[in-house]
Amino acid sequence: MRTQVAIIGSGPSGLLLGQLLAGIGVETIILERSSREHVLGRVRAGVLEQGTVDLLGEAGAAGRLHAEGLPHSGISLAFDGRLHRIDLTALTGGRHVTVYGQTEVTHDLMDKREAAGSVTVYETSKVALHDFDGASPFVTYDKDGATHRIDCDFIAGCDGYHGVSRRSAPEGALKTFERQYPFGWLGVLAQVPPADPELVYANHERGFALCSMRSPQRSRYYVQVPADERVEAWSDERFWDELRRRLPPRTAAAVTTGPSFEKSIAPLRSFVAEPMRFGRLFLVGDAAHIVPPTGAKGLNLAASDVRYLFAGLREFFSDRSQAGLDAYSAKALARVWKAVRFSWWMTTMLHRFPETGEFGQRIQEAELDYLVHSKAASTALAENYVGLPY
């Protein structure tokens, strides 16, 4: 087989890149190690920057997003028993975020790809990337007991933190930066109305909590737990009790409890790999960087990577210029590091760190108090939360 761009990974970044390229007549084949059902079953992020929404619109995949997504003009920080609202729209000249689950984004993009007849090969194994340091890269993989080969012009590694793409970088060519946090997020999905119409980020002596949502009838809640905690130790009753303890009284009283239909613990880490380009192989999204979910940046960073890579590929296929591709890694990493900083800052401000003790708690309290009473500080948070410019 031959295609112009081989895309490794059928998550949102791979699908989005494929749709954008299809719109300018560039052919792609996507290879995915999991089944279609497994990809659609992943529960992930739910807050989209306006730039991500715009890019999905450019890809022709924002119809349901515009109809069902929930525009949010603010968030609340909860501490000292009270809610303190940050007016994102007023502080950023009219910008906002949209709540729409990553599962839905994936579904929309997958439907568009399938309707167009573009090729995605699911349940592949032994994917290997070859000769991307030259002009004729190719990819091999196994499927149904046979080995297959795809010749291509470029390879886009959109296969996440555990994928083959980053591991294929030449030995010694990759530099990584990592911070692992001593806690995780225990999250539940429940078919109950949210406690607040906007997201609530709570700093509490028992640990962080987040009130979020996927729709007006579906809520997503999280509580900070130790890194070695086991999800089996948490009944629904225990979770709801702990969540309400960490929220201000009025917010806690507004929590509607019910059976969870998804419950999991996610570790928190900051991770960046540099560079994001190796010849004709480009790393995209979680293949190159991971951020703690506190700043709602993971999916949005993947989308901004796609935006930069799409621009470079469009320039190459229309003008045979490599200038955009040559600039990809530096442009992407400049935005990545700002989001890594913001996500780290939100995480350190809102979570309990076992090693910092009472001093750390007082520093957090002082920072939060300054933040909500300073327009300059609130503006800095709002600008980062709605998404920095490309």
Language model features: what each stretch is:
Residues 1-5:
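Extreme N-terminal starter segment of soluble prokaryotic enzymes
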Residues 8-23, 109, 264-341, 345:
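Conserved mid-domain beta->alpha element of the FAD-binding
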Residues 22-43:
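Glycine-rich FAD pyrophosphate-binding loop
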Residues 38, 159-160, 291:
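Glycine-rich, N-terminal phosphate-binding loop of Rossmann-like dinucleotide-binding domains
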Residues 41-44, 49-116, 130:
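Active-site-adjacent segment of FAD-dependent monooxygenases/related oxidoreductases
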Residues 66-71, 123, 247-262, 320-327, ...:
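Acidic/histidine metal-binding catalytic segments
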Residues 111, 118-268, 273:
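Conserved FAD-binding catalytic core of PHBH/FMO-like flavoproteins
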Residues 296, 311-390:
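C-terminal helical "tail/cap" subdomain of flavin- and related membrane-associated enzymes
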